[in-house]
């Protein structure tokens, strides 16, 4: 993969002015309003789930560029403040826009995956990420394939890191997931398969065995 394609950050869906703003933030962060940049990235992440999967990488790059250029963290502070605001309003978001809710969970997990303090995940994000995943593991969420898919994808991405930060909450989360799998609910056959795969994935030390991969992914393709 070329350097250009690796660093495009999926910003083609922005208008030309915003693309230029983001490119400048990446190269010369002191030349732009970084709080505005943080809001632009969060706003777009709530609308575009493809971008929300890439946004953490872009945010990390801007944070690194700002730190190197000025030794400051204006962008990170603005980003975390906005994440907190959306976290506080997460129930309203889920009620009015399922897509927006799934994009938000994808985004906050992506940020948790990329942002580091002293080479460790940010403690401030651990409980908010867990709270979002707990909501996805509630019975009414498990009846929606979009939310089950999001739960499983995010646990694949950050589950192992989260467990290292707070193993007790991961145990509690998997009690909910097992109950959802075992108790009579409105689970689709695909959702049931995804939950079983996730239960076995964690039991295997957050790894998919070759046999499990062959079984589950042949089932999904069928």
From Swiss-Prot:
Q: Record's superkingdom? A: Eukaryota
Output the Gene Ontology terms for molecular function: identical protein binding; RNA binding
Sorted alphabetically, which keywords does the UniProt record give? Cytoplasm, Nucleus, Translation regulation
**UniProt keyword ATP-binding present:** no
The primary location reported for this protein is cytoplasm
> Is Cytoplasm tagged as a keyword?
yes
| Gene Ontology CC | cytoplasm; cytosol; Golgi apparatus; histone mRNA stem-loop binding complex; nucleolus
Function of the molecule: Functions in replication-dependent translation of histone mRNAs which differ from other eukaryotic mRNAs in that they do not end with a poly-A tail but a stem-loop. May participate in circularizing those mRNAs specifically enhancing their translation.
**Which protein family is it in?**
Belongs to the MIF4GD family.
- The protein's name: MIF4G domain-containing protein
Write the lineage as a comma-separated list. Answer: Eukaryota, Metazoa, Chordata, Craniata, Vertebrata
Gene symbol? Answer: Mif4gd
């Amino acid at each position: 993969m070329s350097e250009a394609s690796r660093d495009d950050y999926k910003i083609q869906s922005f208008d030309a002015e915003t693309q230029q703003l983001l490119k400048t933030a990446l190269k010369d962060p002191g030349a732009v309003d970084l709080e505005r940049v943080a809001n632009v990235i969060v706003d777009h992440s709530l609308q575009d789930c493809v971008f929300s999967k890439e946004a953490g990488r872009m945010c990390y790059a801007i944070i690194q560029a700002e730190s190197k250029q000025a030794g400051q963290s204006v962008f990170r502070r603005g980003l975390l403040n906005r994440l907190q605001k959306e976290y506080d309003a997460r129930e309203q978001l889920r009620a009015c826009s399922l897509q927006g809710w799934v994009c938000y969970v994808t985004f906050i997990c992506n940020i948790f995956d990329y942002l580091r303090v002293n080479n460790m995940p940010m403690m401030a994000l651990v409980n908010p990420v867990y709270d979002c995943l707990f909501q996805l593991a509630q019975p009414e969420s498990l009846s929606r394939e979009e939310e089950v898919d999001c739960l499983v994808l995010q646990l694949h991405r950050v589950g192992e890191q989260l467990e290292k930060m707070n193993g007790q909450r991961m145990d509690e989360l998997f009690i909910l997931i097992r109950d959802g799998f075992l108790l009579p609910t409105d689970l689709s056959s695909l959702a049931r398969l995804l939950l079983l795969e996730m239960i076995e994935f964690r039991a295997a030390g957050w790894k998919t065995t070759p046999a499990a991969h062959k079984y589950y992914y042949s089932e999904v393709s069928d």
